């Protein structure tokens, strides 16, 4: 499918998104993780294209959206502004990692904009403030080195690296993954710092599905965090995807789709 690309112009920035033009159907909005882009949802979105009006957003400093300093709060505001400008509310919002944090913040701060949400392994842990600061600095430094490294690779080299690192992924996932790595800006690192997730959880009132990985994998959300979420907010359902790491949908695609379909139905 050829997704239709569009730009939304705001006062000082542009947000790019892709859609299927299925106006009149319920809106399903996807928010990607750090260094990905909207098209990285292509394979999942195809499974829902007949039932929904789909929007694949490029976050600021990713894809074809604007470059420049943008905080996590700015990205939440961007998502709210897009939904409002296109008169989509209330939407079903899906997010992975960084995008999951954006979706959760949207549901907490703008409850009227979100009917349901699905979060794929957000960056939520039970570290204390000191540990979180250290972890964030370590992650930011690691991401910065990663961006420098991939900038030196050709597309063929980047594809070979991706396939070697992620042998369980479908070949369909790699074209958008390679493209996204050419479209991420260093300013994107500023969007990774967000308020404590516990505060967000307490303010969420819509039905929510959290999908998390095996504890032995590279997933971020651990069982103790899941237990805290369920104790803090009865709106949440939490499901572990067996055999998956942080990129749940790419590693256990059918199980991921089945979980979403069950939640939406």
Region annotations inferred by a language model:
Residues 129-131, 147-206:
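Conserved alpha/beta-hydrolase catalytic His-Asp/Glu region
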Residues 46, 209-244:
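Conserved loop-alpha-helix segment in the C-terminal half of the alpha/beta-hydrolase fold
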């Amino acid at each position: 499918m050829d997704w239709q690309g569009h730009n939304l112009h705001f006062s000082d920035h542009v947000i790019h998104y892709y859609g299927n033009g299925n106006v009149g159907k319920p809106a399903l909005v996807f928010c990607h993780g750090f260094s990905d882009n909207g098209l990285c949802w292509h394979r999942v979105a195809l499974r829902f294209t007949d039932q929904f009006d789909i929007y694949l957003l490029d976050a600021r400093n990713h894809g074809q959206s604007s470059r420049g300093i943008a905080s996590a709060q700015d990205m939440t505001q961007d998502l709210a502004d897009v939904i409002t400008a296109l008169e989509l509310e209330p939407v079903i919002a899906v997010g992975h990692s960084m995008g999951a944090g954006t979706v959760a913040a949207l549901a907490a701060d703008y409850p009227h904009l979100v009917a349901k949400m699905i979060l794929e392994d957000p960056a939520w842990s039970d570290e204390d403030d000191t540990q979180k600061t250290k972890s964030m600095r370590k992650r930011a430094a690691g991401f910065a080195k990663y961006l420098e490294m991939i900038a030196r690779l050709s597309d063929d080299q980047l594809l070979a690296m991706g396939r070697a690192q992620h042998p369980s992924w479908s070949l369909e996932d790699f074209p958008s993954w390679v493209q996204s790595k050419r479209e991420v800006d260093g300013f994107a690192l500023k969007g990774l710092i967000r308020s404590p997730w516990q505060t967000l959880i307490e303010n969420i009132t819509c039905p929510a599905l959290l999908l998390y990985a095996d504890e032995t994998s590279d997933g971020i959300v651990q069982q103790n965090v899941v237990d805290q979420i369920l104790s803090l907010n009865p709106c949440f359902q939490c499901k572990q995807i067996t055999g998956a790491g942080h990129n749940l949908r790419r590693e256990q695609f059918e199980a991921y789709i089945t979980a979403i379909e069950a939640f939406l139905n």
